[in-house]
Amino acid sequence: MFNLKYFLVSSSLLFSVFSSPVFSNPKVLKVGAIPDQNQDVLDKRFNLFSKELSKQLDVEVKYIPVINYIAAVTGFRTKDLDLVWFGGLSGVQARLQTPNSIVIAQRDIDKEFKSVFVVNKNLELNSISNIKGLKKLKNLRFTFGSENSTSGRLMPEYFLNQAGVEIKHFKGKKAGFSGSHDATIALVNSGAFDAGALNKQVWENNLKNNPKRTSNLELFWITPEYVDYHWVAQGDLENRFGEGFTKELKSVILNLDIKQKSHKQILDMFNAKRFIKAESKQYKNIEEIGRKLNKIR
């Protein structure tokens, strides 16, 4: 259902962010990212990344936080953001709305990405080894992450459908949408929801670094592989930053070296060993699934 209040609040916040003086300066490279995790984590990661880009490209680079996935796509479409870290679905949505945009790179882990399904321990549900076991989630309180998340909604819903489970089969004939992977963990861990789906990397990071946050959770199932996150850039950056800028930008990202201390800090925060080349055609299957589930029209 359309929520007018939410739309107006989101729109006003979006306007206030993108009306900042930095947006009137054509010589500032504006970096954005989908808010898939806690904002403190994102701020640290992308401010560090932006600082390195600025150093190597010799231009001012500014990280601009956004309030939700839609704001990231909108900011890119309106050219208020120049370079954005998108998930598979949001990247496809952004590129379809922004002619001549360019896929710059993906992490080494993004060619073979996975989601996980987790359940609250109180359910005493055993983990499954076959997709058909997802039927055990019927009639439970289930939450996805953001409505436009690839690893927290699109692909989990796709796999659920493959097992014959639709949103109407959950308790109350609906699913929750936590907004981020961290929030999904918190909601299922607290018992507010019985089960949820999220990014496998975020799950593993929380297991390792925040054991209290996952103390009431059990891993239920790991999905098959699919392609996910990627950097997407505007196609006209050279008009503002000079000939060869896009190629140089791509080179800087691809050449981040885990053997260099400052680069390792960045790569560690992306849970990657390196960035690799990526092409838009790799995301064709994501687009097809997005259309099937009415996330792309």
From Swiss-Prot:
Signal peptide positions (record): 1-24
Highest taxon of the lineage: Bacteria
GO annotation, cellular component aspect: ATP-binding cassette (ABC) transporter complex; periplasmic space
Pfam families: Phosphonate-bd
Gene Ontology biological process: transmembrane transport
Localization (cell): Periplasm
InterPro entries: ABC_peri_PhnD-like (IPR030836), PhnD (IPR005770)
Keywords annotated in UniProt: Periplasm, Signal
Subunit architecture: The complex may be composed of two ATP-binding proteins (PhnC1), two transmembrane proteins (PhnE1) and a solute-binding protein (PhnD1).
NCBIfam families: 3A0109s03R, ABC_peri_selen
Family under the similarity heading: Belongs to the phosphate/phosphite/phosphonate binding protein family.
Task performed by this protein: Probably part of the ABC transporter complex PhnD1C1E1. Binds strongly to inorganic phosphite and with very weak affinities to methylphosphonate (MPn) and phosphate.
Protein name (database record): Probable ABC transporter phosphite binding protein PhnD1
